[in-house]
Amino acid sequence: MAYIPRLKEEYKSRVISALTEEFGYKNVMQVPKLEKIVISKGVGAAVSDKKLIDYAVEELTKITGQKAVATISKKDVASFKLRKGMPIGAKVTLRGERMYEFLDRLVTSSLPRVRDFSGIKATGFDGRGNYNLGVLEQIIFPEIDIDKVNKISGMDITFVTSATTDKEAKSLLTELGLPFKKN
């Protein structure tokens, strides 16, 4: 029997029925699902030091278990001393089993390591059922060795869902274990 991530199994067995009951879907295909997770990291100082991009790509690769790619600038910005085509960040897109594994690790081991953690804000929804979460320090992930970090930096995590409204997306992410703050 093939390995199935814990959260994927939980989604199929419990979350689909809970969301169907809550929103009254007529068909299982109407139930929103998590489509992808995009983790991105901007490295503004990379304009002067090219090695910072390599560190960012390496850190994202360690955190996600999938090779990250460097992002490049699309146009010149003279005030930032930036030229078109220069690397300015890194990103990785997770789908399928790796996506569920990352979400599981984020909820169970990484978010509880944040100082004074009382839940994540529910203000990161974009109106179309996607959620954006900012992480201030990469050292909350157990895969990162604190002694080998040359600079503490944050990252953006985007949860792309098939939900059409923010309410549906919040219910989906809450059922999958994201700890939102109580109002």
UniProtKB/Swiss-Prot annotation:
A cellular-component GO term for this protein: ribonucleoprotein complex
Keyword RNA-binding among UniProt keywords: yes
Pfam family name, one: Ribosomal_L5_C
Main function: This is one of the proteins that bind and probably mediate the attachment of the 5S RNA into the large ribosomal subunit, where it forms part of the central protuberance. In the 70S ribosome it contacts protein S13 of the 30S subunit (bridge B1b), connecting the 2 subunits; this bridge is implicated in subunit movement. Contacts the P site tRNA; the 5S rRNA and some of its associated proteins might help stabilize positioning of ribosome-bound tRNAs.
Coiled-coil ranges from the UniProt annotation: none
Stated family: Belongs to the universal ribosomal protein uL5 family.
Quaternary assembly: Part of the 50S ribosomal subunit; part of the 5S rRNA/L5/L18/L25 subcomplex. Contacts the 5S rRNA and the P site tRNA. Forms a bridge to the 30S subunit in the 70S ribosome.
Protein's GO biological process: translation
MF-aspect GO terms: rRNA binding; structural constituent of ribosome; tRNA binding
Domain of life according to the entry: Bacteria
Keyword Ribonucleoprotein attached: yes
Organism: Flavobacterium psychrophilum (strain ATCC 49511 / DSM 21280 / CIP 103535 / JIP02/86)
Protein name (Swiss-Prot/TrEMBL): Large ribosomal subunit protein uL5
Alphabetical keyword list: Ribonucleoprotein, Ribosomal protein, RNA-binding, rRNA-binding, tRNA-binding
